[in-house]
Structures are given as C-alpha cells and as structure tokens.
Amino acid sequence: MGERSAPTRRVDPLGGLLVVDKDGGMTSHDVVARCRKILGTRKIGHAGTLDPMATGVLVLGVERATKLLGLLTLTTKAYTATIRLGSATTTDDAEGEVLTTVPAGHLGDAEVAAGVAALTGDIQQVPATVSAIKIGGERAYARHRAGEQVELAARPVTVSRFEVLARRDVAGFVDLDVVVECSSGTYVRALARDLGAALGVGGHLTALRRTRVGPFTLDHARTLDALADEPRLNLDMDEAVRIAFPHRAIDAREAESLRDGRWLDPVGIPGVYAALTADGTAIALLEEKGKRASPVFVVRPRGLVD
C-alpha cells in the first residue's frame, strides 16, 4: 500500500490570522482540526475558546502567526445572547438538566431592567460550573461531568454593557435578547444565571453569539464552509499586526537591525507594539524597557524571507 501524500499547503510560511465565524455544536479544537485539513498545515492554534453551543468570532493563528496569539490583547469581548427567565439548569445554558421551573410572566420590564443594571459595571462573578477553569490541575467542566460538586470562587469582571434589546413572553417564560460587552473571563451564562436568581425565577442561556473579540469582529470573519470553498487567510501577517497592535514607523536601517534581533531606541509607546516599514511591512513586535525597545517577536527574521 502506498504512502498517503501530505495535504497541499495553501498558505505561505509567514502565515497570518484566520477569523472564523464558528458554527454551533463545534468545539474550538474541532475548528482547528478542520482548518488544518482545509489549509494543509498543522501549524494552527486558537486564541481563547468558544463554547460548543456558541457561534461567532474565533481567532486562529496560522503558520508563523501562531506566535502572535500569546501577544494579542483580546481583553474585551462582545456578544448577543438570549436569556430565558423562569428556568435554571445545571450548566446555566440550554444543554444542562433543568433544576427549577418558576413562572416568570409576572416580571415587569422595570424589574428586569433593575436586575440587568445590578449586573453592569465592575462586579464579582462566580464562573459557570461548566467552565474551563482549572481546579487542582483539572478543568471544572471535567469535574462536573464526573459528578463532583464544583465550587468556584467569585472573580472580578467588568460588564461595560448589558442591554435588553427585545422581550418575548413564551408559555410562562420570559426570553430576553441581550447584548453584552465585557472583559475577558466574564461568563455570559453566569449573567443569565445571576439575573434569574436575583429576580427569583431562575435563568439560563439559550443562545450565544460572539460578535467581537479584541479588535476582531464578524466583519473580519468567514464561515468554515466559505473557507473550504476559498482557502485563504482573512488577514495576512501584515494586516493582522496593523489591526492588532499600535505601531511605529521605522527606516530601512532600523528594519535590518530588528531582523537581526537587535534593539532600537524607545519612543514612549506602552505595551507591545509593531515596527512597520514605510510600505506597511511588519518587521517585529517590540516592548520598551528602560532605554531599549527590544523585539519580543521578530516577524521577518533574516533568512526567513531572504
């Protein structure tokens, strides 16, 4: 039997970012596995995770751009979601077993608005039990599925926007379509749970769609089917760096120094930022400490593109 040929690589070694509009029912790892097949490379990783039930923005790094993932500032996220008031579940979403059912049709809009307002701003939130948080080296969701009683400590999170867009009264339940803008580490499922608890009727999430993570939005995203039909990156390395990081302009001499891993004089930009040539080519990501702006990642080291 002959050996199977390797899949044809569809991207250059420099790579870039793939912003996927994830379908429901897939894990983040499922998305990575399919993208590896479509693009013909194993050098793909994802920044953060998205629950299987959720749809929307998932950021993947391809080829050399996998090294960008740990440097991206993805601290703010935005979602649209549907919360059902009147029913609590074991997982705080529609995939769990129903714990309680309480009629919620009596709730007035003002009561709901007050409950939403109390969960907006800087709050302490107990993460969802079925979460990827590690307890003693094991994920909370794994312990929960093994039948263990999981208790997680409250954590500070910021919910900068929590707004009800529409309300529907359905068979004693109240379904709320909401938009949430929040810090990384915020669980929208937990917002649904806590809103229902505060209103005395229980609550859980029935739909979740991530519309933005950091600077990347649904406008940047493509579905896996679209990717399969036209295998290409959403953002090449230069585009990805320009969108994701502040930047400074450098001349040809400075570019050559950075390609060799040498440092430049600082210019006062905080955090990690990009060094771009006049034509927008990304050479390196820098961080300033003292009197040096040193590379934390050389995008185009000497020898890679020579």
Curated annotation (Swiss-Prot):
GO terms for MF: RNA binding; tRNA pseudouridine(55) synthase activity
Keywords: Isomerase, tRNA processing
Catalysed transformations (reactions): uridine(55) in tRNA = pseudouridine(55) in tRNA
UniProt keyword Isomerase present: yes
List of catalytic residues: D51 (nucleophile)
EC number, UniProt record: 5.4.99.25
UniProt feature coiled coil, ranges: none
GO annotation terms (biological process): mRNA pseudouridine synthesis; tRNA pseudouridine synthesis
InterPro entries named in the record: PsdUridine_synth_cat_dom_sf, PsdUridine_synth_N, PUA-like_sf, PUA_sf, tRNA_psdUridine_synth_fam2_C, tRNA_psdUridine_synth_TruB, TruB_C
Annotated function: Responsible for synthesis of pseudouridine from uracil-55 in the psi GC loop of transfer RNAs.
Similarity-based family: Belongs to the pseudouridine synthase TruB family. Type 1 subfamily.
Name used for this protein in its record: tRNA pseudouridine synthase B
Organism: Nocardia farcinica (strain IFM 10152)
Lineage: Bacteria, Bacillati, Actinomycetota, Actinomycetes, Mycobacteriales
Gene transcribed to yield this protein: truB
